[in-house]
Amino acid sequence: MSEETYPGWYSFIKENHGQFIGALEQLGEAVRKAGPLDEKTSQLIQLAAAAAIRSEGAVHSHARRALKAGAEPEEIYHTLILLTSTIGFSNTSAAMSWVYDVLGEGKG
């Protein structure tokens, strides 16, 4: 993700607390490289975790990252649908609506 595509709040934190964000980004990279999962699978897992804690910003972020890693929209939606029996329909539906926004389908 290029600097200009970061959400405003993230850019503000990065500009004002660069060491903190740098450490956070290094941690993210380290944990993704710590095992055998590929980038797409890792992003889909993180997307599911974000949905489970109802973090709209993290759902947006991991949906974008999953797409960049090669996930198809159907895989992203399926990742969320799989959560229904764990986090409930309303939470799943909310997460799907956040992904819908990211995919550009929520425009208009």
Report residues per predicted region.
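Acidic, glycine/proline-rich low-complexity segments that act as flexible tails and inter-domain linkers
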Residues: M1-S42, K68, A94-G108
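Residues at alpha-helix boundaries and the short loops/turns that link adjacent helices
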Residues: A34, G70, T86-F89
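Mid-chain, well-packed structural core segment of small domains
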Residues: A52-I81
